[in-house]
A protein has these predicted regions:
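Sec-dependent signal peptide cleavage junction
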Residues: 7-24
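Sec-dependent N-terminal signal peptides
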Residues: 1-5
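GH16 jelly-roll
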Residues: 20-219
């Protein structure tokens, strides 16, 4: 299964995203010197617009999980400035979009690599500053480029990080799989490392994906 990246949220900012092949798998988290990684793709967002060879801007509603925003292509919602990708949520009374009957009053940004960049196994990370606005739910996650084993959740989902604007000490990692939405399974972790500063500060969130195993990292 090859997966691509999906990034959505309100005032979520990323200065870099990268994918790497893992050369060595035997070192502890704090032994950064011996982590031998060979980047296969990265985006530093150094220009003034999103790289269309790597990214799509998703523009529509999102019907799941009570999301109440319309994702927009507008530059005020998705822009690249000063070495960062900015996904911005805005109060827009009366906003409506297809795919989400609950949408209204808010617009936001959502980008994905679907159909352009995908990987099977390796290490994926991004440096992200999250919002602190109430009811925001930004995320950095991976979903199959093609539904090899069937529709969600059969083909899986890897959530590298999801946060809540109402709780700046919350950062969840997750994975979903199963035969149906009524029989889906997931594994979720919320324990944050000692000394972790709130999610509105810059942090690097990553996942190391090997056959039969997912390891999640913060900083």
């Amino acid at each position: 299964m090859a997966t691509g990246l999906f990034i959505g949220g309100s005032l979520l900012t990323l200065p870099t995203v990268q994918a790497k092949n893992t050369v060595s798998d035997d070192y502890p988290l704090n032994d950064s010197i011996n982590w031998n990684l060979s980047p296969v793709w990265r985006d530093e967002f150094n220009g003034t617009s999103l790289d269309s060879k790597s990214w799509n801007i998703y523009a529509s509603g999102w019907g799941a999980n009570n999301v109440q925003s319309c994702y927009s292509r507008s530059e005020e919602n998705v822009n690249v400035k000063n070495g960062s990708l900015n996904l911005v949520g805005l109060y827009k009374p009366g906003a409506r979009c297809k795919g989400n009957e609950k949408s209204g009053n808010f617009t936001s940004g959502f980008v994905e690599t679907k159909g352009k960049k995908s990987w099977t196994y390796g290490y994926i990370e991004a440096r992200i500053k999250m919002p602190n606005n109430k009811s925001t739910w930004p995320g950095f996650w991976m979903s199959p480029d093609k539904p090899t084993y069937g529709s969600w959740p059969r083909s899986g989902e890897i959530d590298i990080v999801e946060t809540k604007g109402s709780n700046l000490n919350y950062a969840a990692a997750d994975a979903h799989w199963g035969l149906s939405t009524g029989n889906k399974k997931h594994a979720q972790g919320r324990d944050l490392p000692a000394g972790f500063k709130d999610t509105t500060q810059w942090h690097t969130y990553g996942v190391k994906w090997t056959e039969g195993k997912l390891e999640y990292y913060i900083d």
